Amino acid sequence: MKNSLVGGLDDRQVKYLGPVHEGKKHDKRLCDEEGTRFPAGAALYRDSAYQGHEVPGVTVHQPRKKPRGGELPAEDKATNRLISSVRVVIEHLIAGVKRCRVVKDVFRNTKEGFDDLAMELACGLHNYRTFWRHQDY
């Protein structure tokens, strides 16, 4: 199971969940086919799997790769650390969704739309957990 997921950095909740695709599809191709739109002026932190995917009106932050046979400048290393510190929040969000084993294990159900429903339930449970985690009792 694979789909695109947009999460909020402030509340660590799933904001957008794309339709489920087969797991073998590349991340960039998945985003190109979906045509996900973002609000103007949004910041997008992504990994190198989305290299070449352009989103109009969005500030894209992507880590720099070390040049072949060379070294990465100290400024780029510092930028990569900053991007990684933001992206780790989203990686933890994805791990929170994958606590539901139906999402991360081999999915053998062939009923139409059941894979989307399972992913929606997993994201809903994650949002429920994070909502109560950040509330004052």
Where are these regions (language model features)?
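Short, well-ordered secondary-structure "scaffold" segments embedded in the functional core
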Residues: 1-137
